Curated annotation (Swiss-Prot):
GO terms, biological process: fatty acid biosynthetic process; phospholipid biosynthetic process
Organism field: Ureaplasma urealyticum serovar 10 (strain ATCC 33699 / Western)
Cystine bridges: none
GO MF annotations, alphabetized: phosphate:acyl-[acyl carrier protein] acyltransferase activity
HAMAP family: PlsX (MF_00019)
Enzyme Commission code: 2.3.1.274
Entry-linked SUPFAM superfamilies: Isocitrate/Isopropylmalate dehydrogenase-like
Name of this protein: Phosphate acyltransferase
InterPro entries cross-referenced by the UniProt entry: FA_synthesis, Phospholipid_synth_PlsX-like
Family of this protein: Belongs to the PlsX family.
Residues forming coiled coils: none
């Protein structure tokens, strides 16, 4: 059986190395029959954490790291960084996919420069999975990789995200993020995307307002990187604010009884919206499977991101995306 090979960038994030190495070990043992995880980073730091398992994990050694405060310009001076090395390995087809928790802007830029775009694609997109109230997810893209987009870009994003959504849902519903649901609403690129999607064979439902994102009105929601990023961060901020408010209120003696009664409900709500279960965001539009997780990722988030990457590679999603794009563009 041909093994799936995953490159795991172990450097440049805010948490300790123990989290990523433990996740690598545990995930490997869940799929050891068809999986190889290549660790990219400082071998002297990695090996002691692997203990007796070090022979099971190829290591690409480097002591150079792209830090969270690096800029695209400063990162160019670090060509031997773990991120650069992993991307070059992926470009050379020495692995099937890559996971990093490193600097987002630098990662997208270097992935674009190293891997290159798919045919028909002009811009890359970040696509996280947004947890919804019914326990499902909405594929939201773009959330910051590309700002200056046109309707054709949004159309292409919808095609690619739809391919991934089909892993979970047979006939994904697709929408465009807008300030209203009426056809006349939005900017010219909204109108262009709307017309293109209406004439496609995607299950297009039209414009979607931000207020319904968490209700999973659609399975795929496309936006420009500016609007998508604001929507995502607003949801994250509101969730954090509500959580902090409730914690402070329930600490008050007069609310103790109410806190005890409502604890199961809020525990259920927390689980439904727990982003740690969906902690990987795809960089779509590039000729490779690339997943980015949070810069402060812990063990659980690395496990979640590895699962997303592994399942996507196993389903041959990159080739499915290429086929779907070629079908739309007549090749």
């Amino acid at each position: 059986m041909k093994k799936i090979k995953i490159l795991l960038d172990t450097m440049g994030y805010e948490n300790t190395l123990e989290h990523v190495i433990k996740a690598a070990k545990d995930f490997y043992y869940q799929h050891e029959d068809d999986l190889e995880i290549i660790l990219v980073g400082n071998e002297q730091l990695i090996k002691p954490l692997l203990d007796n398992d070090w022979r099971l994990f190829p290591i690409v050694h480097t002591e150079v790291s792209i830090e969270q405060n690096d800029t695209i310009l400063s990162a160019r001076k670090k060509q031997n960084s773990s991120m650069h090395l992993a991307l070059r390995y992926l470009k050379d087809k020495q692995a099937n996919g890559m996971l990093t928790a490193g600097n987002s802007a630098v990662f997208v830029y270097n992935a674009y420069a190293t891997i290159g775009l798919l045919e028909h694609i002009k811009k890359p997109a970040f696509m996280p999975f947004v947890p919804t109230i019914d326990g499902g997810v909405t594929n939201l893209l773009d959330v910051g990789a590309s700002i200056d987009l046109d309707g054709r870009d949004l159309f292409n994003f919808a095609i690619m995200a739809n391919t991934i959504a089909k892993m979970r849902t047979p006939n994904p519903r697709v929408g465009v993020l807008n300030i209203g649901t009426e056809d006349h609403k939005g900017l010219p690129y909204h109108q262009e995307a709307n017309e293109l999607l209406k004439t496609s064979n995607l299950n297009y439902v039209g414009f979607v307002e931000p207020k319904t994102i968490l209700e999973r009105e659609v399975d795929v929601l496309v936006a420009d990187g500016f609007s998508g990023n604001i929507a995502l961060k607003t949801m994250e901020g509101v969730g954090k604010t509500i959580s902090n408010f409730l914690k402070n209120e329930y600490k008050k003696p007069k609310n103790l009884f109410a806190a005890l009664l409502s604890k199961p409900i809020f525990k259920k709500m927390k689980k439904a919206f727990d982003y740690k279960e969906h902690a990987g965001a795809f960089v779509l539009g590039l000729d490779g499977i690339l997943v980015k997780t949070h810069g402060s990722a812990d063990y659980q988030q690395f496990m979640s991101a590895l699962k997303i990457l592994y399942e996507t590679i196993k389903a041959d999603v990159l080739n499915e995306i290429k086929k779907d794009l070629n079908n739309y563009y007549g090749q």
